[in-house]
């Protein structure tokens, strides 16, 4: 199959805009007449420093990042933040609040327990992580050093539709699977972070946006590469950053601006998700897994109710160019990730394929 015949519904690493890949391919051997690939450039070279500064400025503009916050381009994946956050924001004996609404928030809370007292402010685990708690369900600790939540749960297909009110306690949010898909008031957050491999760039880059007031209080035992203050002081270049991924993020941000920015993405994501959810709600074979009020626009989870039929559908879809629809091993079923670069045509093809499969099963 050719690229135009395939739609990639992977939860991450995920689909990138074809236009971005074409630009990267054209510049691969000779970036802007430098005679070098970006892959070969010194991170201290003028060429790369210009790429770095431009990408940072584009992200600041795209998310309207206030001057109180610093943008960091880090390594280690979003999972490294599970440790980095408590090491930098707490002292031994401090209390923190965690909302456990999915697998990754659960892992983050367990990791934080190594460093401080974790209070579970909310959990949907008993319900199979199929819903997001309402504000009035949150049990908040007034002495908490921060409140942590994961905005979009890729595995279970749920998303927070609101920013929690915490009474002034700094909010830390994992936005890995929804960043750049809608406007965000960054000023409400102490830390926003995201692994880039879902909506931003290839795997290998982690973006952290931090209120500078929260930095500089890390524990003495904090590894030097895990100090927010050190990375702020060195402008993310204490060591060699993931240079090519930063360049790719810049290209994605150029593409994003042409699509109307995050406001344009919000309209697109809602329209794409509606196409799929509308079909799921009328289907006699397939059904959605998440509670309607908590449904994610980025990751749509669904199943038939029979594991064998689910597997048959995944194979049926693959033969028609629809890739990576198998659900996460923790949840099973199917999952369609509708990130920014997924065109509406891909969702329409998926719905058509689901209808064809359903008709064959005479339901």
Set out the residue ranges of the language-model regions:
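Conserved N-terminal alpha-helix of the aminotransferase class I/II PLP-enzyme fold
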Residues: 34-81, 88, 103, 111
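PLP-dependent aminotransferase-like
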Residues: 79-145
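Active-site C-terminal subdomain of aminotransferase-like
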Residues: 196-277, 291, 361-363
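Conserved active-site segment immediately N-terminal to the catalytic lysine
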Residues: 172, 186-197
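Conserved PLP-binding catalytic core of the aspartate aminotransferase-like
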Residues: 286-316
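PLP-dependent enzyme catalytic core of the Aspartate aminotransferase-like
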Residues: 1, 6, 319, 332-363
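A glycine-/small-polar-enriched, mobile loop at the entrance of the PLP active site in fold-type I
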Residues: 5-56
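Active-site phosphate-binding strand-loop segment of PLP-dependent enzymes
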Residues: 112, 124-179
């Amino acid at each position: 199959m050719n690229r135009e015949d395939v739609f990639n519904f992977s939860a991450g690493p995920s689909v990138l805009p074809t236009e971005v890949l074409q630009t990267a391919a054209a510049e691969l051997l000779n970036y802007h007449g430098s005679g070098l690939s970006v892959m070969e450039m010194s991170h201290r070279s003028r060429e790369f420093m210009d790429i770095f500064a431009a990408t940072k400025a584009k992200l600041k503009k795209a998310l309207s990042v206030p001057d109180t916050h610093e943008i960091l381009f880090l390594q280690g994946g979003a999972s490294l933040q599970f440790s980095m956050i408590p090491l930098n924001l707490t002292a031994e004996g401090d209390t923190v609040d965690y909302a456990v609404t999915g697998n990754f928030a659960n892992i983050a809370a367990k990791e934080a327990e190594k460093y401080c007292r974790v209070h579970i402010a909310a959990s949907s685990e008993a319900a199979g992580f199929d819903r997001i708690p309402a504000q009035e369900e949150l049990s908040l600790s007034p002495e908490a050093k921060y409140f942590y939540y994961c905005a979009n749960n890729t595995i279970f297909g749920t998303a927070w539709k609101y920013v929690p009110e915490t009474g002034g306690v700094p909010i830390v949010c994992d936005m890995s699977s929804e960043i750049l898909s809608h406007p965000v008031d960054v000023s409400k957050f102490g830390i926003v972070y995201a692994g880039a491999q879902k909506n931003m760039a290839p795997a290998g880059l982690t973006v952290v946006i931090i209120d500078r007031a929260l930095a500089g209080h890390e524990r003495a035992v904090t590894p030097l590469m895990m100090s927010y203050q050190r990375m702020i002081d060195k402008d993310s270049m204490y060591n060699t950053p993931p240079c090519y991924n930063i360049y790719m993020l810049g290209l994605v941000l150029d593409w994003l601006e042409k699509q109307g920015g995050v406001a344009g993405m919000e309209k697109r994501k809602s329209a794409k998700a509606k196409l799929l959810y509308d079909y799921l709600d009328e289907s006699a074979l397939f059904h959605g897994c998440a509670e309607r009020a908590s449904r994610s626009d980025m990751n749509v989870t669904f199943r038939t109710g029979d594991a064998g039929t689910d597997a048959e559908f995944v194979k049926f879809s693959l033969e028609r160019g629809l890739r990576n629809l198998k659900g996460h091993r923790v949840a099973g079923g199917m999952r369609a990730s509708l990130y920014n670069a997924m065109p509406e045509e891909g969702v329409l093809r998926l719905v058509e394929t689901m209808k064809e499969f359903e008709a064959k099963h005479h339901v």
